[in-house]
């Protein structure tokens, strides 16, 4: 069994009585600095264990730096940081590297250690950088059962120094345990109250007081007419009516396939929530109530709600039968890692809810590949609405809608250059100090429209149509959920998960872009992206982070199906990776674990790592 303990979760005094129940400890990987107590926490104390309390320890990255620093090494900054960089690792083929051949390993560090000749820690492996010279990559303690590597053996791009090095550590740990006659106590189930659940873990279902007596039944009918326009369908269903709610998930270009139009009415249930509240707001038919969360958080409330809305009998070829459509804010994700969002300032400046969703029980699905359109409902006895909607769609004129040009003058206010450059320098200092492996610096650009455009061209819907025309993308969206309206045009889909049984969660991070232009061929785009250490490193960092997040939910059944492949889109070439995870068939999990898998993966993945890579940095920003 594996248990994950945060380095500030226990004091050594509290942990010490429980160490005999464990066979070994792995510490690391960071980010942070080993000479900052808040970064290293309990780890520093583990190196000082008395002989009777000693336990084999394997350090990774920050773990190596802490081990070496504790026993007399010097800590220095690299001349050139190595985040997401692959290096050849030299070793002597002994100890951790017994029966290990050539090693190409991924590094995520800006700090390194310099070992002293008379110290108690000795070098097992090293890299030889052009920029940094010789850098220690693995060490062992001369007398204690402590080993460590500076690189990341778990990275998807580490070759030769991964699983075999871990196996060697386990072999060395067992050998030391046998020689010293260390006794490992049998696990006591009562220890769950101290350490929580072993990895991986899906929480048991919340009480299902709202379980439906019978599942909702999906009724689906196909429209005979082929090739209906997404825009025409939307406008026939009320997209023009700015005062009403409207939702569209739009596959406006290849490789997107299905577009989903939510057919809303005044009785459609709206769900909103703001970070810090202890209630969910529910609105329909012009009335609103606040439902107390009780002991639940918003995530478990949503999972419980959706469990009560299970549907069956739909067309399995369609990705959506009914459910929640809307947005979740960045602040909701940041709140999950206990970072203050400056709540009072945030609410004063921003009236947009952090959770803004609508439950869609009637919908229209358009299939761009086949040209087919489907009308569906999960409301009982709703066949009349389906028939009338099909008749309305059948009678639509061909090509009736176009996006009108905006003739008003546009002024753009960019961020202050001096302030922006100073923020870049702050980011660079954080990177060199070891506070983070990457940072995403954002700044607001304000676009103002002068003049008085006509009401027909100034609506959010017309603006979305212009966006869709100028930048068609496979994962576009128009969400009009007052007080918020979201217009989106993106080639990237963050997360998808298939229906049970055999639910597969898939993430497709895009890091690396080349704009299409005359003379920019696929070969040139591939050279610019795949041939760029910076672009590959950025993609690799996110791939490894996603693998970590998925492993935390589904266990070891995580696979990188595609790594850094150039894909063609309407206006750009993109560097795309694909990571998938699913529950192991033999996992000891609740009977309905797959029902909550999507929610758990989404929760675990927020806030996205590229925007919140380090607690220290976002706490200070």
Describe the predicted segments one by one.
Residues 5-6, 78-80, 562-563:
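Short beta->alpha connector loops at strand-helix junctions that form conserved
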Residues 29-34, 63, 154, 330:
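Short glycine-rich anion-binding loops that position phosphate/pyrophosphate groups of nucleotides
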Residues 30, 144, 154, 444-445:
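Flexible loop residues that form catalytic
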Residues 42-60, 65-167, 171:
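Pocket-forming structural segment of enzyme catalytic cores
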Residues 153-202:
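Acyltransferase
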């Amino acid at each position: 069994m594996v248990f994950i303990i945060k380095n500030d979760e226990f004091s050594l005094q509290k942990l010490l009585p429980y160490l005999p129940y464990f066979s070994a400890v792995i510490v690391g990987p960071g980010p942070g600095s080993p000479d900052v107590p808040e970064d290293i926490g309990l780890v520093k104390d583990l190196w000082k264990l008395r002989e009777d309390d000693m336990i084999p320890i394997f350090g990774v990255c920050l773990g190596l730096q802490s081990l070496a620093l504790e026993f007399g090494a010097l800590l220095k900054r690299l001349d050139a940081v190595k985040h997401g960089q692959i290096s050849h690792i030299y070793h002597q083929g002994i100890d951790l590297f017994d029966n290990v051949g050539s090693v190409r390993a991924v590094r995520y560090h800006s700090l390194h250690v310099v070992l002293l000749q008379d110290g108690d820690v000795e070098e097992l492996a090293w890299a030889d950088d052009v920029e940094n010279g010789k850098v220690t990559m693995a060490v062992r303690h001369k007398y204690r059962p402590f080993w460590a590597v500076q690189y990341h053996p778990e990275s998807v791009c580490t070759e030769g120094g991964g699983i075999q090095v871990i196996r060697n550590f386990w072999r060395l740990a067992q050998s030391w345990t046998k020689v010293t006659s260390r006794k490992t106590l049998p696990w006591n189930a009562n220890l769950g109250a101290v350490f929580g659940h072993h990895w991986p873990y899906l929480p048991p279902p919340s009480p299902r007081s709202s379980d439906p007596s019978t599942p909702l039944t999906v009724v689906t009918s196909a429209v005979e007419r082929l090739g209906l326009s997404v825009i025409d369908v939307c406008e026939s269903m009320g997209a023009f009516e700015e005062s009403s709610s409207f939702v569209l998930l739009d596959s406006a270009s290849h490789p997107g396939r299905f577009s989903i139009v939510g057919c809303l009415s005044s009785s459609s249930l709206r769900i909103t929530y703001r970070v810090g509240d202890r209630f969910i707001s529910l609105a329909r038919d012009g009335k609103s109530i606040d439902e107390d969360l009780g002991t639940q958080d918003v995530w478990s409330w949503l999972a419980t709600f959706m469990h009560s809305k299970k549907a069956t009998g739909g067309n399995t070829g369609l990705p959506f039968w009914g459910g929640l459509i809307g947005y979740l804010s960045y602040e909701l994700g940041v709140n999950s890692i206990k970072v203050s969002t400056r709540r009072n300032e945030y609410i004063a400046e921003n009236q947009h809810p952090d959770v803004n969703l609508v439950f869609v029980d009637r919908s229209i699905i358009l299939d761009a590949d086949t040209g087919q359109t489907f009308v569906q409902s999960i409301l009982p006895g709703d066949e009349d609405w389906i028939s009338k909607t099909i008749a309305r769609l059948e009678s639509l004129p061909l090509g009736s809608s176009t996006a009108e040009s905006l003739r008003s003058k546009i002024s753009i206010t960019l961020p202050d250059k001096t302030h922006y450059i100073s923020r870049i320098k702050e980011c660079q200092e954080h990177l060199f100090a070891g506070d983070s492996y990457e940072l995403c610096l954002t700044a607001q650009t304000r676009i103002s429209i002068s003049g008085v455009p006509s009401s027909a061209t100034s609506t959010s819907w017309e603006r979305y149509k212009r966006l869709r025309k100028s930048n068609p993308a496979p994962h576009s969206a128009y969400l009009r959920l007052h007080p918020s309206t979201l217009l989106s045009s993106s080639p990237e889909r963050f997360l998808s998960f298939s229906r049970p049984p055999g639910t597969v969660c898939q993430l497709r991070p895009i890091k690396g872009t080349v704009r299409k232009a005359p003379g920019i061929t696929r070969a040139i785009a591939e050279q610019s992206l795949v041939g760029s250490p910076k672009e590959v490193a950025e993609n690799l960092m996110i791939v490894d982070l996603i693998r970590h997040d998925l492993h935390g939910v589904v266990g070891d059944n995580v696979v990188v199906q595609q790594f850094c492949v150039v894909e063609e889109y309407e206006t750009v070439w993109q560097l795309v990776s694909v990571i998938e995870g699913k529950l192991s068939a033999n996992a000891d999990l609740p009977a309905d674990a797959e029902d909550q898998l999507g929610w758990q993966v989404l929760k675990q993945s927020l806030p996205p790592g590229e925007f919140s890579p380090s607690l220290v940095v976002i706490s200070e920003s």
